[in-house]
Each structure stands twice: as C-alpha cells, then as structure tokens.
Amino acid sequence: MRLILLGAPGAGKGTQANFIKEKFGIPQISTGDMLRAAVKAGSPLGVEAKGYMDAGKLVPDALIIGLVKERLKDADCANGYLFDGFPRTIAQADAMKDAGVAIDYVLEIDVPFSEIVERMSGRRTHPASGRTYHVKFNPPKVEGKDDVTGEPLIQRDDDKEETVKKRLEVYEAQTKPLITYYGDWAKRGEENGLKAPQYRKISGLGTVDEIRERAFDALK
C-alpha cells in the first residue's frame, strides 16, 4: 500500500495517517515530522525551515525533496509507505514521478476552510509539557490555565488566526492544484511505465471514527 494523503492544514491528515499506517503496516513519511525534528535539532536545514514555518509559508521544494529522498532509502519503505504533507506542489509531484516513486492511491480529506480556521485558531498549548487544549472542543478546567500545573497556556504563532488564514491561502495557490493533477493522471492511466494512482475523496467532517471508516472504505 503506497499512498498520498492530501488536504488543507488542519484537515485531520495526521490523525487519519496513524490509523492507515497501523492497518496496513506501513511507515508514515511526514515531512512535517522531519522538519520539526530538524528545527528541534537546530540543524542548518531546521533553522532555515523555521523561518518559513513561523511565517505560515511553505518550506521550499529543494529542502523538502532532500529529506524525502533520504527517507525512501530506509528498509521499512520496501513494502509501502504513506506520504503525509508531501508532495505540496506540482513541482514536487513531478519530481516524485520522475524518480519513479510508485503510488497506489491518492486520498483527499476535504474540510471547509471556515471549519479549519475554527479548529486551529482555538488550540492552546502548555509549553513546558506539550499538553494541548482547544477553547471549544477540549477546554481546560480553568480558562487559559493548564489543568495539571495551573500555569498559563499560550497560542502558538502558527495557530493564530491570521497565520492559519495565510497558510490556507498558500495551500489554495500551491497545493490544491494537486487535486486536479492526480485526478487527471488517474483518468489518463499509466505514464512512462508508472501506473497511475487511484484518486479518492472523503469528507473530513464528523467524528474521528467516522472519518477513519470513510478512509478505510476508500482504500479497499
């Protein structure tokens, strides 16, 4: 099982990726995880990427593709893989195709932008522990305070409404065209000896379990 998960930031791709990788026994290749690790390590790549991420912009293709090419060499990718957050652009999708990276399915999780803004801008974090809350869906017992320590909660820069909206604008311009790209390729069929992936679209609204079942049904 080799697949790509598509959807806007905050659509729930990460949650569903966990279910899919467990069901099919494949690794999740998340460029977000790779980037966060690089940022945490303070590597040159991480420092450069952090500037883009804090501004709500996409990290350039050259930085991402270098990470992904290294990851695909690992032995656990031999029987399949799940791309979460990659490709983000047509150029990256073309680079994958040129490299002969086989994909069986492209699964889009569709969530209205208004819902995403509410989901993401409502997040609050306790910096010391990493505990997360949501002002509407998972509020702390005392507003603005961590349940365990009583210390103040913060809103991360990349969860602020203006940053979320900026990320969605970038997604609309750079990543959403992939929906057409893969949909058209699925209709055309095999190209350059590479089998076209099957394209599937599901709603990302509802409970986590409901969305999981939709995803599993789409990948049968």
From Swiss-Prot:
Subcellular localization: Cytoplasm
Region (Disordered): 122-150
InterPro entries, A to Z: Adenyl_kin_sub, Adenylat/UMP-CMP_kin, Adenylat_kinase_CS, Adenylate_kinase_lid-dom, P-loop_NTPase
Catalytic activity: AMP + ATP = 2 ADP
Binding of AMP, residues: T31, R36, K57, L58, V59, G85, F86, P87, R88, Q92, R156, R167
Pathway: Purine metabolism; AMP biosynthesis via salvage pathway; AMP from ADP: step 1/1
E.C. numbers: 2.7.4.3
NMP: annotated segments: 30-59
Record region (LID): 122-159
The record's note on its domains: Consists of three domains, a large central CORE domain and two small peripheral domains, NMPbind and LID, which undergo movements during catalysis. The LID domain closes over the site of phosphoryl transfer upon ATP binding. Assembling and dissambling the active center during each catalytic cycle provides an effective means to prevent ATP hydrolysis.
Role, per record: Catalyzes the reversible transfer of the terminal phosphate group between ATP and AMP. Plays an important role in cellular energy homeostasis and in adenine nucleotide metabolism.
Name of the protein this chain belongs to: Adenylate kinase
Organism: Burkholderia ambifaria (strain MC40-6)
Gene behind the chain: adk
